[in-house]
Amino acid sequence: GMRIVNREADMIKEYNEARTESLKAFGSEQIFIEKYLKAPKHVEVQILGDQYGNIVHLFDRDCSVQRRHQKVVEYAPAFTIRKEVREKMFADAVRLAKHVGYKNAGTLEFLVDADQNYYFIEMNPRVQVEHTVTEMITGVDIVRSQILVAEGYPLSSSEINIKSQKDVLCNGFAIQARVTTEDPTNNFLPDTGKIAVYRSGSGNGIRLDGGTAYTGAEITPYYDSLLVKIISYDRNFKVAAKKAIRALQETRVRG
């Protein structure tokens, strides 16, 4: 139901056709008109807030590599964005979270265009699949921290140990690659069946997060196609990329 209008002369025609299409499909002529961003960057800012109004950001991550409009490779920090733009996004993310009185871990998502103007999309009030890369570069256990926050611990407590934004440091680079049970020859549609052979990659600077990845596992159509997450870390981005590639090459899934 989305239409891209590149010329002003086409605006009225496309507008009317979209309204007609909406009426037939949903019984309403209501449509939304938004600025079109061509091949934008998808950048997220991770935040963490306690029950006492304290909120910090845990820097950002780039989630632009996608298939079927869903993420498949993420890395942190989002170093291809200019420093001053990133700092503005950090400030806006914290400001928005404070405005709504947000508590716990959350993610604010932005689109960044070719001129590095950024646009807020939405906020996800939960831990996301790609939180791992943020954990690797900050050393903050986001899952543990959100549980402690829910129990009533302030960020400044010895259990969480984030007294101010200055306590959150960004060190090195992390990359996450999602290994999924999908068929790349069929537009990445989810596949099902029994895993006959499973072998994971490993090595220094490699983290694996998985649940159903093992020999004999039955992959059903009732759950997400994500099998395992391979996360690499290094002080140097190119080295982190080499580690990720090696771990992916070592991974074997047959079925």
Positions of predicted regions on the chain:
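ATP-dependent carboxylate activation and anion-phosphoryl transfer catalytic cores
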Residues: 4-255
